[in-house]
Amino acid sequence: MKYILSIDQGTTSSRAIVFDKNANIKGIAQKEFTQIYPQPSWVEHDPTEIWGSQLGVITEALANSRILPNEVDAIGITNQRETTVIWEKNTGKPIYNAIVWQDRRTAKICDQLTKEGKDKIILEKTGLVLDSYFSGTKILWILDNVEGARQKAENGELCFGTIDTWLLWNLTQKKVHATDYSNASRTLLLNIKTLEWDDELLNILNIPKAILPELKESSTIYGKTDKSLFGAEIPIAGIAGDQFAATFGQACLKKGMAKNTYGTGCFLTVNIGKEPIINHERLLTSIAWGRKKSVTYVLEGSVFIGGAVIQWLRDGLEFFRKSSDAESLASSASDNGGVYFVPAFVGLGAPHWDSYARGTIIGITRGSTKAHITRAALESIAFQSFDILNTMKKSIPNFEIKELRVDGGASQNNLLMQFQADLLECKVVRPKITETTALGAAYLAGLASGYWQSAEEIVSLWQVDKIFEPSMPKNQKEKLLENWNRAIERSKSWIQNSHSL
C-alpha cells in the first residue's frame, strides 16, 4: 500500500503528516522552533533550524506510522508564505536569517514607494497592496543590509526562495531551485496575469532576476528527494502556500466557495475562478494553485493576529496554561462586559492595512475580569474575519456567502465558531479533518503522481463534523459591530514615527 507525505512548514512549528487514500491520518509529528525578535516589530527564523526540524519530523512521522520511505507515493509541501530566505548557491548557506511574513521592518520602504506612486503599478500587476508583509521589500532589505549581498546577487551567486523553495532545494540536495505560482504570487514580483516574473516590478524593487526560482504549477513533479536523506528517492509532486493548500484541502474548488483558516493569523479566501479580480478595497488577489495548464485565483483577506492573541494571553499575561482553556474561561462570562480587544500587535491587515496601528483593550472597568478580556480576545478574531467578508461582498459581483468552511487550531473553539456564524449570518461548517492545509498539499501531490485520479474524488472525501447556525438577534449583532468599529478606530495610527516600528 502507498501513502502521501505532507510537509507543513508553519510560522511556529514544522510538521509532517502521512495520509492514506481515504485522507485518513496514519502518522503525524510536529516540532516547534525558535522565534527570533532582534528588535520591536522584527521577526526572524533560522532557516537551518527550519530545515533541521522539518527533516526530523518527516523521519518521526514515518516511524510513528510504521511506513517505509519507499511506501511513500509522493510528497506535498505547504508553507508559511512570504517568509524570505536568501542563500549562497554553492554552499547552500543562508546569508541572513529568514525574514518572517509578520516582520514590519520594511514599512518605511513601502511608504517611500507609495509616495512615488509605485503602489498602483504593483496592485495592477500582482493583485497585492504594497505592504511589508510580502517578500519583495524583504529581499531588497537583505540585499542592501548584508555586506556583499548585492554584488553576489548580481553575479548570480545567490538564490532567493520562500520556505517551499528552501525546503525543495534541501530535499533535492541543491538540484532544484523552483517555486509554485501560489507562493510566487505573494512576492510582489510575479505578474499574476502573464504568470511570469515581471521586469518592471524587479526594477522598482531593485532585485536581480538571477536570484529567482523557476516557476512551476502547484501539482506537478518537481524532482525527487536525494537518496542520502531517506534511503529512497521520493517524488516531490505538490507545492502550495499554506492558505491556498487549505482552500484546496477544504474542497473549495468551485467559484464562490469560501474558507477561513484560524491559525496564528486568520486567512479568509474566496475562490474567484479563472480570471483575476483586481480589488481596490485593499483585499488581495492571488493565485491559489496552478494545475492542468491553468490557474485558479482567490480573493483573500489576511488578519495578522488571530489565534496568536490567545497565545499572548497564555504566555504574556499567563491567564491560563493551555490555549484550549480559553474557551471555558471565556464561556464563564455571559458576554464581553463591554470590553473590546483589537490585537493589532504588528499593525492591522485587511481591510485596514495600517502598519502604525497597535493593540488596544478598551471598555475596561473595575468589574472587568480575565474572562471578559479572554472573551473579547476570542471575539476579536471573529470581528476581524467579519470585516474581511463584508468587504468581499462589496468587491465580488453577485457574491452571497451561503456557508463558510473553517479550519485551523482555533476552529476547534465552539464559542468562537458560534460567534462567527452569528456575525456573518451564515452557516459555519467545520469538517471532520481540520488538517486541511497539509491535506491540500497531499491532494496536489497525489493528483500529480496519479495517487488520486480527479478533483471529483477529492470533493467526495470532504466530510462535515459540525455546523454552526446563526442565532443572535440582529440588533444585538449591530450594537457589537458598532462598538468594534469604534475600538478599531482607536487603535489606528498609534505609532507616530517610523523609528518605533
From Swiss-Prot:
ADP binds at residues 11, 15, 264, 307, 409, 413. Pfam families: FGGY_C, FGGY_N. Sn-glycerol 3-phosphate binds at residues 11, 81-82, 133, 242. Inhibited by fructose 1,6-bisphosphate (FBP). Belongs to the FGGY kinase family. NCBIfam families: glycerol_kin, PRK00047.1. One of its GO terms (molecular function) is ATP binding. It comes from Borreliella afzelii (strain PKo) (Borrelia afzelii). Gene3D superfamilies: 3.30.420.40. GO terms for cellular component: cytosol. Glycerol binds at residues 81-82, 133, 242-243. The keyword Acyltransferase does not apply. Key enzyme in the regulation of glycerol uptake and metabolism. Catalyzes the phosphorylation of glycerol to yield sn-glycerol 3-phosphate. It catalyses: glycerol + ATP = sn-glycerol 3-phosphate + ADP + H(+). Pathway: Polyol metabolism; glycerol degradation via glycerol kinase pathway; sn-glycerol 3-phosphate from glycerol: step 1/1. This is Glycerol kinase. ATP binds at residues 11-13, 264, 307, 311, 409. It comes from the Bacteria. Keywords: ATP-binding, Glycerol metabolism, Kinase, Nucleotide-binding, Transferase. The gene is glpK.
